[in-house]
């Protein structure tokens, strides 16, 4: 059997996958823009509307999101964390100090969360359904954090990772509840969130002492 036809077939498959991935990202970017538009109610946003906004056919959009908006929410987390992982891996190639890697990981997640804005707020409150449907992130962020903590202090890695995880989720919950019209929740702005996440590592290491 000649190997050349296989190479051509592999090339076609790679191009098809690249096209699929490009369209998928275009659709997700469209969804993020719509969810962050204050003039549009999130409940009114549909797969069809996302497709129209992206300049993609509705049939193509449903090929990417067969289970409606649940697929969109899952993709927001998946693509968002992929971006974080790519940035972290590039940073790790520079052989940083273990503490710098942990801080960079947390800061990168926080910046990605802020970048996605209301889209991630809306998706977060569907997280149970996302997990149950198998559309959650491939590679749990906590596992990445724990691995980074082991590089920092192998003996107390579990406790350090747990403390960081709790502090991070506390900040994230408050940011998720941000509401400019309500005094209590109005202070948990994007700036507040990024600043407080940046302080988590120092707070967690103090708890360990």
Residue ranges, per PLM feature:
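N-terminal intrinsically disordered/low-complexity leader segments
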Residues: 1-22, 29, 208-209
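Hydrophobic alpha-helical connector segments
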Residues: 88-115, 164
């Amino acid at each position: 059997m000649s190997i050349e036809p296989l190479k051509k077939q592999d090339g076609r498959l790679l191009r098809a996958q690249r096209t699929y991935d490009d369209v998928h990202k275009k659709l997700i970017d469209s969804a993020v823009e719509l969810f962050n538009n204050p003039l549009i109610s999130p409940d009114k946003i549909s797969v069809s509307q996302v497709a129209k906004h992206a300049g993609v056919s509705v049939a193509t959009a449903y090929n990417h999101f067969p289970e409606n908006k649940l697929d969109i929410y899952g993709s927001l987390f998946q693509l968002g964390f992929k971006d974080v992982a790519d940035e972290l891996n590039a940073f790790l190639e520079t052989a940083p100090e273990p503490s710098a890697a942990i801080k960079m990981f947390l800061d990168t997640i926080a910046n990605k969360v802020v970048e996605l804005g209301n889209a991630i707020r809306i998706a977060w409150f569907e997280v149970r359904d996302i997990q149950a449907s198998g559309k959650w992130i491939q590679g749990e962020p906590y596992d990445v954090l724990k691995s980074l903590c082991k590089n920092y202090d192998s003996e107390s890695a579990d406790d350090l990772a747990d403390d960081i995880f709790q502090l991070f989720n506390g900040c994230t919950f408050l940011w998720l509840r941000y509401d400019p019209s309500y005094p209590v929740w109005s202070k948990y702005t994007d700036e507040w969130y990024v600043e407080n996440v940046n302080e988590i590592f120092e707070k967690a290491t103090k708890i360990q002492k």
